[in-house]
A protein has these predicted regions:
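Beta-strand-dominated extracellular/periplasmic modules and repeats
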Residues: 1-234
Length: 234
């Protein structure tokens, strides 16, 4: 029988702290007992993840899901999904969700006093190509207030969910935008101790993929597990 190779563990200080005093909700939901490391079995290392037939060719374009154009700055977000050894991850499911240009989510729990956009649902999905590339067309999300502390605002961000080759490469994370002054004030972003690891969550302006008179582009590469792993969301 061939040897079962497990995944490398994350580097210390590169993932968000389970209990971060400045991020209030972690106090109630973080583990209260020491974590137990369990061996990786065949089902976790090679297990199936999703059905590719669920993804439509146009699901990557969040600006074409309704009859009209959504309000806001149109942007392109693209990048590559890589494994812990730097190899492309083909046929990986990439899903995104976000607030609209006014900083409002369409779900009922969002009570932010900002307008909804009937032409923007704020969610999309795609599958990486043979070289691990993905691409979304969307609207730049707005910042919004949250009640973590006095005058708290979340920086503009896009949520990402990825399914790699197996269950252990599952990742939920957030992408931020370069130059945002709210980043250093945001407890979620700052809960990652290592500064270099935090910067992995910040996209880069991408002139090469910017479409003249149509949309600015941002690049966001994602690494599933390993020493250079993209930090997860907690």
């Amino acid at each position: 029988m061939s040897k079962l190779y497990g995944y490398r563990r994350y580097q210390p200080r590169t993932q968000p702290k389970y209990d971060f005093p400045f991020y209030a909700s972690t106090a109630k939901r973080h583990p209260t007992k020491p974590l137990v490391i369990v061996p990786q079995t065949l089902s976790e290392v090679t297990g199936p993840v999703f059905g590719h037939d669920d993804v439509k060719p146009t699901d990557h374009d969040l600006t074409r899901q309704h009859a009209g154009e959504p309000i806001g700055e149109r942007i392109i977000v693209s990048g590559r999904v890589l494994d812990e050894s730097g190899r492309p991850v083909p046929h990986a499911l990439v899903e995104v969700w976000q607030a609209n240009a006014a900083g409002r989510y369409p779900h009922k729990a969002d009570q932010h006093d900002a307008p909804l956009d009937p032409n923007f649902s704020g969610a999309g999905r795609t599958v990486t190509d043979a070289q691990g590339h993905y691409r979304f067309i969307t609207i730049r999300p707005g910042e919004y207030p949250w009640r973590n502390h006095y005058n708290a605002w979340r920086p503009a961000h896009i949520h990402f969910s990825l399914f790699g080759r197996a269950f252990l490469t599952r990742l939920v994370t957030q992408m931020y935008f370069p130059g945002d002054p709210l980043l250093t004030l945001d407890p979620m972003y700052m809960s990652i101790p290592d500064e270099k690891a935090r910067r992995r969550l910040v996209s880069q302006f991408d002139l090469q993929n910017t479409v003249p008179e149509h949309a600015l582009a941002y690049r966001f590469d994602i690494v599933l597990r390993g020493r250079a792993a993209t930090p997860m969301e907690r």
